[in-house]
A protein has these predicted regions:
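Internal gly/pro-rich beta-alpha loop/helix module
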Residues: 46-154
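Structural motif
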Residues: 11-13, 37-39, 41-42, 69, 71-74, 163, 165-169, 334, ...
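Short, solvent-exposed amphipathic alpha-helical segments in soluble enzyme
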Residues: 26-27, 53-55, 83-87, 177-183, ...
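Phosphate-binding active sites in nucleotide-utilizing proteins
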Residues: 160-234
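C-terminal and late-domain segments of enzyme folds
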Residues: 156-158, 170-180, 184-188, 272-276, ...
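Cysteine-nucleophile active-site neighborhood
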Residues: 212-286
């Protein structure tokens, strides 16, 4: 509701397939009455496109299914065949042509970040032009969201300075996490380990997830930062390291090319990149500070002699990621959602 207050259009990207996961994209759409636009790869089908669309639209009664968008069509004729195959009354949001020049490059954790693609505006303009020329349906009626006031959060971190790594290596940061820290009263100080920045004067540190393995040479060379973090932890100050942040705290990191780099050494062990996905999904962790919800998504595996403080759990009760703790250092593959428990977050950084 807060995002809708100052936006004309909200586009919510689902994860995996429409009905996959707990909760699924369909669950979220049904819960909040959000119209669903199915993006269907039409590259290897024609009339079957309509059958797939029909299945998605009718699989769950009550789903607010608004229509479809065809991806990777080979020609205008191909797009017309896909459109003509749709059941009567189903919305057609257009078609995107099979165009290698417009494809956004990706890596193991998804698309490259926008700042890494020099001609991203040109690519997006090309895709927008294709949609403008092929769409024949208006946007659905606006969704009315309940006006939910923001939660009242006590300023438990008032006067506390939290240093946050933020650059090409550490960029997986939920905006809601920053909002929660600010609501708790924390002063946020950002720095770039890749650029060689020193650790700012601070009371706590957050090393979020990202791609440290892609910037291993620069990070390995920033020994002054690792020394400062060791001194920070030795002084009894809090440090939260998530996923790529945790990888950086091990003694070594082996990248996808098989090259091993020396890293911080705050945690014994090594983190090794894998070719296959190691973990994906929602998890929660019952820490001494309280329960925190989160998400895990990584292609690396870590080997350490450390015993976990606790293990996170998946939504269906299975054992999840290890949560390590040494003094005030907390490390895990889980990307925590601070808004799920602001008091626990304050205790982690306080």
């Amino acid at each position: 509701a807060r995002a809708a207050a100052d936006s004309d259009l909200i586009l919510i990207e689902g994860v995996m397939g429409l009905f996959d996961g707990q909760p699924s994209a369909a669950d979220i759409a049904e819960r909040f009455g959000i119209p669903v636009m199915a993006l269907i790869d039409a590259g290897a089908m024609a009339q079957t496109f309509g059958a797939v669309a029909h299945g998605l639209a009718t699989y769950r009664p009550g789903l607010p299914f608004a229509g479809v968008l065809a991806n990777r069509v080979g020609s205008e004729r191909h797009a017309a065949m896909a459109r003509d195959s749709l059941p009567a009354g189903m919305g057609w949001f257009g078609a995107l042509p099979r165009n290698p020049d417009a494809v956004l490059p990706e890596r193991h954790l998804g698309l490259l970040q926008a700042a890494e693609i020099d001609d991203i505006e040109t690519r997006l303009d090309s895709l927008a032009d294709a949609l403008a020329a092929s769409a024949v349906v208006d946007l659905p009626e606006p969704v009315e969201f309940d006006d939910v006031p923001p939660p009242s959060i006590a300023p438990l971190l008032a006067g506390r300075r939290v240093a946050i790594a933020r650059d090409a290596a550490y960029g997986f940061i939920y905006p809601a996490n920053l909002e929660t820290l600010r609501s708790l009263g924390a002063e946020l100080r950002f720095f770039s380990p890749v650029a060689g920045d020193a650790l700012p004067e601070c009371d706590a540190v957050w090393l979020p997830g990202g791609y440290p393995e892609l910037h291993a040479a620069a990070l390995s060379a920033n020994q002054a930062l690792w020394a400062a973090l060791r001194a920070h932890v030795a002084a009894g100050k809090p440090l939260l390291a998530e996923c790529g942040g945790m990888m950086s705290l091990f003694e070594k990191v082996t990248d996808k090319a098989g090259e091993t780099h020396a890293f911080a050494g705050l945690l014994p062990g090594i983190s090794v990149m894998q070719k296959r996905l190691a973990a994906l999904g929602m998890q929660f962790a019952d820490l001494p500070e309280g329960r925190l919800q989160g998400h895990t998504f990584h292609y690396s595996k870590s080997e350490t002699r450390l015993q976990p403080l606790v293990r996170a759990q998946t939504q269906d009760g299975r054992e999840g990621e290890a949560i390590y703790r040494q003094e005030r250092l907390t490390a895990s593959y889980v990307h925590f959602y601070f808004a799920s428990n602001p008091a626990a977050t304050a205790a982690l950084f306080g």
